[in-house]
């Protein structure tokens, strides 16, 4: 019933986009209409309405976030292309996501263009931290219900090892109060496990040696700062890792027995290997979230 209620309210609001667009055109002429591109219903309604009521308007969809192999909504089939409302141009945050959309979606050749990461300019201001070995580990969670599974995974892997201090950073959508009852342990009874007090992300990252994640985009910031990352694959049907095609300064594990070994491998990494891996990882992130420049901004001009 809750799903039905949410769906009903959502679809009503999205259908209103048609009338918003139509009424707006009574007052202004729209040369170019730019919106986010996540293949949401309301976006399609906007594109369809503009083609109906203002055929001369150019439409741009901005792919503004990460794209994983689990982002099925972003991968259009040949059959869908024949009838699905689409923007005239899709602009991406960088070359990596452009490549993912082209590889897994059946977009026309000239539809997708790589640009820059408008929402992630801050990432270029993050300072590289020294490679530290303080046995402190940050676990970054997403804002989805299943995020508690990662905490349980880490606990089952490290609860017997008191040498490591594990800090859990929750997502604003799923604060610790919402996941506590789903955990397999009482965090107050384990001194080596604690919850971040939601200090700025860069501070949490700076104070830890390693990041453990499932699908969190915090992994991109971590690599930019030179923090090794460990991706936990929680029996995923499809890959939710935003760094699926990056193997630099990154370890991927699938069972609890592998986590202590991965952590040891990180700490045993020679300094020259770390620097080499960091440079390759940073290069990957810079292609994923490309820097804002005048040339790249010109992709928003039709």
Residue positions per predicted region:
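Active-site and donor-binding regions of nucleotide-sugar-utilizing enzymes
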Residues: 1-121, 219
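Structural motif
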Residues: 31-32, 89, 136, 165, ...
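Short, charged/polar "capping" segments at the starts of alpha-helices
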Residues: 42-43, 68-71, 97-101, 122-123, ...
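Short, aromatic/basic amphipathic alpha-helical patches
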Residues: 45-51, 104-105, 154, 178-189, ...
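Catalytic binding pocket for nucleotide-activated donors in carbohydrate/polymer assembly enzymes
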Residues: 102-114, 183, 217-287
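Conserved catalytic-core segment of nucleotide-activated headgroup transferases in glycan assembly
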Residues: 107, 112-184
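Donor nucleotide-activated moiety binding/catalytic core segment of transferases
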Residues: 174-225, 229
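C-terminal alpha-helical cap of glycosyltransferases
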Residues: 286-302
């Amino acid at each position: 019933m809750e799903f039905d209620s949410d769906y009903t309210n959502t679809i009503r609001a999205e259908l209103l986009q048609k009338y918003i667009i139509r009424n707006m055109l009574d007052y202004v002429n729209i040369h170019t209409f730019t919106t986010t591109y996540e293949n949401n219903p309301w976006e399609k309604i906007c594109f369809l309405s503009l083609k109906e009521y203002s055929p001369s308007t150019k439409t741009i969809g901005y792919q503004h976030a990460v794209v994983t192999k689990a982002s099925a909504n972003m991968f259009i089939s040949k059959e869908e292309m024949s009838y699905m409302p689409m923007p005239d141009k899709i602009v991406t945050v960088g070359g990596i996501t452009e490549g993912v959309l082209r590889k897994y979606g059946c977009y026309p050749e000239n539809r997708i263009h790589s640009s820059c990461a408008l929402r992630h300019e801050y990432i270029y201001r993050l300072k590289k931290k020294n490679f530290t070995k303080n046995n402190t580990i940050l676990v970054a969670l997403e804002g989805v219900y299943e995020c508690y599974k990662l905490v349980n995974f880490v606990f089952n892997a490290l609860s017997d090892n008191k040498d490591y201090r594990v800090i859990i950073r929750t997502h604003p959508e799923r604060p610790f109060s919402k996941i506590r009852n789903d955990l397999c342990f009482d965090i107050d009874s384990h001194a080596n496990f604690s919850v971040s007090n939601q200090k700025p992300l860069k501070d949490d990252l700076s104070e830890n040696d390693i990041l453990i994640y499932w699908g969190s985009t915090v992994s991109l910031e971590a690599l930019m700062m030179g923090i090794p990352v460990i991706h936990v694959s929680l029996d995923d049907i499809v890959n939710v890792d935003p760094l699926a095609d990056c193997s630099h300064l990154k370890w991927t594990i699938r069972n609890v027995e592998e986590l202590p070994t991965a952590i040891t491998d990180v700490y045993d990494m020679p300094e020259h290997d770390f620097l080499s891996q960091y440079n390759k990882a940073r290069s990957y992130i810079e292609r994923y979230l490309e820097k804002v420049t005048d040339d790249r901004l010109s992709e928003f001009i039709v």
